[in-house]
Amino acid sequence: MNLQNIIREGSNYLKKNNIKSAELDSELLLSEVLKVSRKNIILNQDQDVSNEIFSKFKNLVILRASGKPIAYLIGTKAFWKYNFFVTEEVLIPRPDSELIIEKVLDLTKNKSKIKVLDIGVGSGCLLLSILKEKKDFYGTGIDISKKSLEISKINALKLGISNRVKFFKSDIDNFVSGKYDLIISNPPYIKSIDLKYLERDVIKFEPKIALNGGIDGVSEIRKVIDKSSELMKVNGKLVLEIAFNQKTKVKELLNKKGFYVNKIFKDYANNNRCIICTRL
């Protein structure tokens, strides 16, 4: 069987199982099995493959049809300008979160030797993207998950910035190391009661601990704000990702802790997404 027929068979199976990006996913899964680029597959569709390759491909297609995200199946996710290693231990990087990178780069355009803290570092996509762009910035990432930190370290090595970043296993309440010019965080912000309404791919496979924002959706955001007020230098900046309906509540929490809200930015779907504030 040649590549074209394999892709068609995989696509048809995925379509029957309501996978919207069926053809693209088939190409990506075949790329993973063959260890070649998607472009290579598209340009060589008449190439025949062995039964062993076809069998491996089918197994991945079945997993994808069950809802398992493509990023977990191929072990990588594109974010900002880079490809990040991911497993089921970390949340898959979202395009909406790139807004944080964009705004941080605007904020720090003329800054140097900034110390950055990422609370809940996960795969490292936020912190490491910033450090990759800003060659004289130094970063610290904390997470309660040992596996997440291992993945962040792998991504730091891949990007060649391990010498400018440190990682610590800690929850935010117990972290006391240093003072920072900039703190970033994409904390869990979905109400516990709303988790069941998430897409099948998300609720079935992604880590609940990275999604669950507690009864009111802001329990983790509250912790980040409280601790940031202690860990941040005067006039330091806090950049948070929030849910579309949390603007008012988060502003209240920030004001109580002595932060001035500079601006709230909308994402590409015109939802409130990123809040920037200054510690007074």
Please tell me what each predicted stretch does:
Residues 161, 206, 232-234:
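Helix-to-beta-strand junctions that scaffold the AdoMet/dcAdoMet cofactor pocket
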Residues 29, 67, 97, 126, ...:
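Residue-level signal for inorganic ion chemistry
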Residues 215-278:
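Conserved Class I SAM-dependent methyltransferase catalytic core
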Residues 96-197:
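Conserved SAM/SAH cofactor-binding pocket of Class I
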Residues 189-220:
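Mobile active-site "lid"/loop adjacent to the S-adenosyl-L-methionine
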Residues 1-57:
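A short N-terminal interaction module
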Residues 32-107:
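Conserved AdoMet
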Residues 93, 118, 141, 213, ...:
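Conserved SAM-binding loop
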